[in-house]
Amino acid sequence: MKLSELKPPAGARKKPTRKGQGIATGQGKTAGRGHKGQKARSGGGVRRGFEGGQMPLTRRMPKRGFTNIFKKFFAVVNLEDLNRFEEGTVVTPEVLLENRMVRKGVDGIKILGTGELKKPLTVRAHAFSGAAREKIAAAGGKAEVI
C-alpha cells in the first residue's frame, strides 16, 4: 500500500443531491418541499418555540424570583490547591492571580476546606469556610479576613 493509492472506503463519500434539476432526477419541480404552503417557501417555517398561536410553554410558566444586583461573586480556592506554595508564604489575592488560580473580575476570594493543607501558610482572603479555618490553624498557619 502506498500513500498515493489511499482511497476512502466505499460509501464514505456520497454526492449531495442537486434539488430542482428536472423531473427525471426525482428531486425536480418541488424539490422535496411538497406543494405550496409556508414550508415550501424560501425562509419558510415557524420560529423556535412557536406553537401555532397557542400561548407557548415558556410564556405559560409563571415568573419567579429576581436578580439581586448587590450579589457578590467569590472565586473559590480549595485548601489542597494551596500546597503548591512554599512553607511560610503569605497567600494573598494578588499571589493567587499571579499563579492563575483565580481570574480577574471577581468580587472576592473564598477559601474552602476540600483536601488537606500540609504546610503552615498565612492566607489572606475575603471569606473562609469553617473547615478551611480549622485546617489552616491545624497546619500551623493563619487565616486572615481582608
Curated annotation (Swiss-Prot):
GO terms for cellular component: cytosolic large ribosomal subunit. GO terms for biological process: translation. Residues 1-59 are annotated as: Disordered. The keyword rRNA-binding applies. SUPFAM superfamilies: Ribosomal proteins L15p and L18e. PANTHER family: 50S RIBOSOMAL PROTEIN L15, LARGE RIBOSOMAL SUBUNIT PROTEIN UL15M. This is Large ribosomal subunit protein uL15. It comes from Desulforudis audaxviator (strain MP104C).
